[in-house]
Amino acid sequence: RPLNDQHHELPSMQNELQEAAPEAPATTKGWFNRTVAGAGLTSALGDFCYETTTVILPGFLAVLGIPAAALGIIEGIADAVASFTKMVSGYIADKLGHRKSLVLVGYTLTPVGQVFIALAAGWPLLLLGRLVSWFGKGLRGPLRDAIVIQAVSPQTRGRAFGFHRAVDTIGAVIGPLLGVAVLGWAQSLHWDDAAGPFRFVLWLSVIPGVLAVLAFLALVKDPEHSPNPGLRLWSTLRGLPGRFKRYLGAVGIFGLGDFSHSLLILGATQLLTSSLGVVQAAQVAGLLYVGRNVVQVVASYPIGAWADRIGSLPLLVVGYALGALTAVLMVLAFWFHTASVPLLAGVFVAAGLYVAVQEALEST
């Protein structure tokens, strides 16, 4: 399932879930501050880095001669690693008392993973690169969200996270657009093999990944926290409120049916190849994915503001229903061998809407 970004970034256990954690009243905390802005900029740069890979990865696998099924296996294993990391990252941060340092490590691992992918000549390095990147994403996400949560009031969390996810997705729009454009330009140059243009784009994508680390280091402030070396993971999990455990169960059930949206790109490419040819089909599929990210960035802030008024739960239910609809529509597209760009665009729009709900509200 997607971690784009896209992915279940829950707050640090002790700092966010225990009612004893102090929260300033709404009158003393505005939702737009240096921490929210810095976290948003950092996420935008991080998304620029790895979403560029997402949009060209299916084509990269094709020129390397790696079967399409390998993409599903690689993404599935990487998502599993990210999910496990998210579960324990809050515990580790509370035990050590260093949230910001761990977030910086997480952001550093994204460009490191990109380097492995750029060097890959087969599936092992691709898998290693994805594992490193998604481990970093799983490590940083919950802790970054916990920092943002403590920087705003409870009454404005929806708006803060809606803004954060919107800025985050701007990077996810610009990155793939530039990636597709640079890929088209690079193909006109002389390369030793067909993978050369793809490697060139992957190397360029490392730059915003490094800038993300510097932005978080310079802009985001996190109060010092006392380490808790006696904290135990399983006793902490057992002590979580029953309502939160039920929420985690629901999120986990949805996660079992969720899937990486790299597979949407791959599926659209396969469906359109018969009518457009593989190169043009891959370009159109990449643009459809950019459209999905545009839908997400446009919808994120309004969804967060709406959740502040009516509550997050009803909108999360709608978002999960849209996620199920997206999967059903893609299955039907393959069942009927749909090669219609407008119909496939509808699938990507539904995907953008449900990810906007998921990303903006799950952490609040």
Predicted features along the sequence, with ranges:
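Helix-loop boundary and gating motifs at the non-cytosolic
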Residues: 25-82, 245-288
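Residue-level signature of mid-helix packing/kink "hotspots" within the transmembrane helices
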Residues: 51, 79-87, 172-173, 293-301
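Transmembrane alpha-helix termini and helix-breaking/packing motifs in multi-pass membrane transporters
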Residues: 59-63, 174-196, 267-271
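Helix-to-loop junctions at the C-terminal end of transmembrane segments
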Residues: 85-98, 183, 298-312
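Cytoplasmic membrane-interface "Motif A"-like loop-to-helix N-cap segments
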Residues: 95-107, 309-321
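C-terminal ends and interior cores of transmembrane alpha-helices
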Residues: 108-121, 321-338
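Intracellular juxtamembrane helix-capping segments at the cytosolic ends
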Residues: 139-152, 357-364
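C-terminal membrane-cytosol helix-exit motif in multi-pass small-molecule transporters
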Residues: 206-226
